[in-house]
Amino acid sequence: MIPDVSSDTLFWLKANPQALQGIYRGVERETLRINTQGHLAQTPHPKKLGAALTHKWITTDFAETLLEFITPVAQDIDHMLTLLRDIHRHVARHLCNEWMWPMSMPCFIDSQQQIKLAQYGPSNMGRMKTLYRKGLKNRYSAMMQIISGVHYNFSLPLTFWQVYAGVSDMNSNKDIISAGYLGLIRNYYRFGWIIPYIFGASPGVCQSFMKNRDTDLPFIKASSGFLYLPYATSLRMSDLGYANKSQSQLDITFNSLKEYVFRLKHAIRTPYADYQRIGLKKNGSYLQLNTNILQSENELYAPIRPKRITKNEESPLDALLRRGIEYIEVRALDINPFSPVGIDEEQVRFLDLFLIWCTLAPAPKMSTRELLYTRLNWTKVILEGRKPGLTLIVDGGSSKKPLATIGKELFSAMQALAETLDSHNGNIQYQQVCHKLRACIDQPELTLSARILKEMKKYGIRGLGLTLANQYFQILLEEPLEMFNELTFDKEQIRSWHRQLELEALDILSFDDFLAHINSHQQ
């Protein structure tokens, strides 16, 4: 059932310790700004944090109040997490009577009218980013778009591909490297449900989130008023969060990069009836970028994405096709409410271990049928992952097996890899993480979702969220910066505003012509 990393591969890894030296990592963390009463902040993005359009490390996602922090790429885990913490510390110093909401599912919201679209200035690029968000609002509702998460970016070093696959350089051997990452992604789809099982932290939602929404989910109402599913792990990953029916027809199986790009480009240029009914414009004002299945590739909701840094006006899909996959973006992480920065070292080490295992383990091609079954498994884990005796579909749909059995097999498979990784580093950190998290299989009460649900029942979502938000705010406020300094942040703030002004001055096309140009480049 569980594909094993062969003893030959482990022997090779032990004999080539340099292969995994220099893994590139990065974190993107989203968080809502709230006032001290627990309501969504109604203030614009603080000017002292720089221009959201052009700042390297501090921007906004869907809403003006939805902050997004982006770490520089780092090779050391502690270094990366310290950079992330420094960004949080800096932001805490520049919030006025506001805190950062510490959970994935939103705080109390009286009305969707309180959710203001992120603003990026009058440049064509800035207006397009806001219009894209307006399209998301019109397609899926604003409430769904202010769910927060953590994205983990992961890239294996060139030395790995050189030794593992005989690659000489990134450019001439891009197809080999891309094939390796696609194998990782296929195994991630097959077994990545382990991430929401262990780290999912959104088993409940504020009642305001469900206002005017129909659902068949059998919610239980807690005494404090919030709604929850007793065995849920990540409602953020469910149909309540990032899901839509228009994308269910996209038959993306990650068997080849060309196929992946072709199917996404097809979605970007194929009209969709529901979105055509919304319309492109109303009273001369744009309602969305276009009326197609996807406005752009960013609209694809997936638990993992292949990525490549773009050049100039290049689209992300063209960049992938021309130069291959550069890194992968893990998108299945809820905000860790027990961490001031939404993620901790234990999670990063587990992700490293799991992603390396996904790369080294056999990853046969995936049929459309198997992809459907993997999605069903994810859904079961997301909605009832801690349910005793829960079974998952295995062997391409031919049989079922208890989650607990598969989970133990998975950890056994990763244990040997953890030992090999630790032998390179002269410690037992990966083995410790493997041993500790393995206990979550037999003891689901140790998972993040079980732990946070227990606290939610005790204090309510609002009470717990405010307590943690205030606690983390005070901690971050009192801690000194370690990697960055205030001068660095000041310089980046000034640079970001100058760059935004440059973009505004460089515009030569009307917004209509600019949009037509962008849409034609996505064909």
Swiss-Prot record:
EC number: 6.3.2.2
InterPro entries: Gln_synth/guanido_kin_cat_dom (IPR014746), Glu_cys_ligase (IPR007370), Glut_cys_ligase (IPR006334)
Reactions mediated catalytically: L-cysteine + L-glutamate + ATP = gamma-L-glutamyl-L-cysteine + ADP + phosphate + H(+)
Gene3D superfamilies attached to this UniProt entry: 3.30.590.20
Swiss-Prot/TrEMBL GO biological process terms: glutathione biosynthetic process
Pfam families attached to this UniProt entry: Glu_cys_ligase (PF04262)
Keywords: ATP-binding, Glutathione biosynthesis, Ligase, Nucleotide-binding
Pathway listed: Sulfur metabolism; glutathione biosynthesis; glutathione from L-cysteine and L-glutamate: step 1/2
NCBIfam families on file: glu_cys_ligase (TIGR01434)
Similarity remark: Belongs to the glutamate--cysteine ligase type 1 family. Type 1 subfamily.
Name of the protein in its database record: Glutamate--cysteine ligase
The organism of origin for this protein: Baumannia cicadellinicola subsp. Homalodisca coagulata
